[in-house]
Amino acid sequence: VKQRKQIKGVNKPLSILEIAYDNIPVNKAKVNYMDIARYITEYVKDTGYTYVLIKGSDSIFEKTGYCYGASGYYAPSSQYGTATDFKHMIKELHNNGIGVIIDFNVAYFGIDIRSIVNYDGGDCYGYLKPRIIEKPQMNITTFAYEKGEVRSFLISAIAMWLDEYNIDGIKITDTATMLYLDYGKNPGEWTPNMYGGNENL
C-alpha cells in the first residue's frame, strides 16, 4: 500500500493476466487462496505480466453461461478460504510485485434466496416492475440505480474491496446491462423508459 504513492503507473508498462479460479490447474478439492497465490506468482514471473485480473472474487452462487449472480458483494468467495486467507493472497502477490484487479459486477444480482433480492421484504435494491429488471434466461435482476440506497451499497462495497482487501483496481463488468433496458431480452420482456426508449435513465 505504501508503494502505491511512489509508483507512477502511467510511466510503466502494463500487462494484465485475466484468470478465473476455476481455470487454475491445481487440485480443485483442496485448493486454497495461498495455492492460488503461489500458482499466479510462478506463472506471472515466467510470462512477465504486471497485474492479474481475478474473475469471480466476490461470493457467487450460480453461473449461467458467461454471467453469474453475486451474493456476497462485501466478501470474497468462501470456497477457497476465509477473508483473512484472501488478504494473505493479495499480500503475497503484492510482495512479488504483482498488482491485483478484480472483476466486480454492479449490473445485476441473482434472484436466489441467498442473494439480496427482496432483502427487506420488498424491492430494496431492484425495481417494482418485473419486466424492467428480470432476465429469466439468466436468473438475474438489475439494480435500480436511482435509489440512494443502491448507490450507497455499491459504492461502499467497492470502497471496502480497495481499503480492506488492498486490491489495486476494479473492472466493472456487463455495462451494457446497466445502460439498456432491453439488453439480452426479447420483445415484451422489458418496459420502455418514460420517453419510450430503451436507455436506462
Q: Which functions belong to the PLM regions below?
A:
Residues 3-14, 18-199:
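Substrate-binding/active-site clefts of carbohydrate-active enzymes
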